[in-house]
Amino acid sequence: MGERDDEAEGILEKAKIPLLKDQNVAEEENGEIKKEIWLETKKLWRIVGPAIFTRVTTNLIFVITQAFAGHLGELELAAISIVNNVIIGFNYSLFIGMATALETLCGQAFGAKKYDMFGVYLQRSWIVLFLFSILLLPMYIFATPILKFMGQPDDIAELSGIISVWAIPTHFSFAFFFPINRFLQCQLKNSVIAISSGVSLVVHIFVCWLFVYVLELGVIGTIATANVSWWLNVFILFTYTTCGGCPLTWTGFSMESFTRLWEFTKLSASSGIMVCLENWYYRMLIVMTGNLEDARIDVDSMSICMSINGLEMMVPLAFFAGTSVRVANELGAGNGKRARFAMIISVTQSLIIGIIISVLIYFLLDQIGWMFSSSETVLKAVNNLSILLSFAILLNSVQPVLSGVAVGSGWQSLVAFINLGCYYFIGLPLGIVMGWMFKFGVKGIWAGMIFGGTMVQTLILIFITMRCDWEKEAQNAKVRVNKWSVSDARK
């Protein structure tokens, strides 16, 4: 019996050995996956963290400018709000979009370690955006008749026209700020951008106080302060770049930057259209709401929801930047699988944050609403939109990240067509039908634009991303990098 027991124990021990090996392998694989997730998270947040800070501080320049103008009077506040949101806002989103061409080119070049191309890309972007800024000057010069044509009261339109002319220096600063911002971002020098934005904001607050309360320059003083702050930001980043901060990627000004401008313009334009179609879509939501019967309450409630949504969008837009850089870097390095992994990590983390924020907004909207209005009627209207606002925030936690994948992969033209179709041929008509034909008012307009536009666009982007052949995209990135290289341009 003893011998049989020993044999049985021996058999059991032998049977346990492969099980233990499998368990050890599984534990090792688990550990490797956790390590990979942690490493990718660190790389992602090295971009996302400073990007959130930068976006908040640059947007605060506009907010603080309006706040100082608001203390001068209702007319001044209305005029500078129109200039910031309509005149400057139109061009601001266009330049942001056009500068994302650098995220594709510089991001992939950085991954491929072809650093000599960076400086030429940056200079080409400066040239293209500067030419576009000249073409857009009539919007500032003829702001008064444009605003009157749009139905603005004469006094607001007249003052807005004067402010717009004084805002021209800010307009030109965008042509230099956004390209150099993307240039540094693709090299993971995000802390430099954040420091520059923080310094500019502090200076902006001080100069605003000086111009408005000490020198008593009025509303012109507030917009002049914005000019100082934006150009200070450009000066800091330009000095850092050209004075040794980027030794590998900046080798001085080059005549090569004047070559292949038409191809660069087409890529920049498709990037600009992709971003603008989305930005203008939400601006149209406010315009459409203004045509409802109880327009004042509806516009106020929708404006509050858009303000909350705009502040929350700083997070997914930072993930947009982080995703585009990470995907572009990995594709440029020929790592299709790692680009896919970077996309999954970014979407997952942004979605988790989006779920948390959307739930908090849903339950705390009453308290948050008091920050914007003390009117019980307006707050009740805002509360009625809580479900739509929460759902919009949830969708926005995914959609910009997928757009970042598109930018990192160079799909701007495709996404521009998707945005056009989803937003303006599906979402907008559906919003009109639900708002007016079915008498759902502002809830119908917004629901139609969310489910018909944003949701359909998000589903299409998810489908495209899931079907993507990442190894093929890595090959495409290699071809693109070689095509745009300085050495090729010289041949």
UniProtKB/Swiss-Prot annotation:
Membrane topology classification: Multi-pass membrane protein
| Gene Ontology biological process terms in this record | xenobiotic detoxification by transmembrane export across the plasma membrane
Per UniProt, the keywords (alphabetical) are: Membrane, Transmembrane, Transmembrane helix, Transport
* Protein origin, superkingdom: Eukaryota
Q: Where in the cell is it found?
A: Membrane
Q: Which residues form a coiled coil?
A: none
Pfam families xrefs = MatE
User: Which molecular function term from Gene Ontology is one that the record holds?
Assistant: antiporter activity
Family classification: Belongs to the multi antimicrobial extrusion (MATE) (TC 2.A.66.1) family.
Name of the protein described by the UniProt record: Protein DETOXIFICATION 28
Give the source species.
Arabidopsis thaliana (Mouse-ear cress)
Phylogenetic placement of the source organism: Eukaryota, Viridiplantae, Streptophyta, Embryophyta, Tracheophyta
**The encoding gene:** DTX28
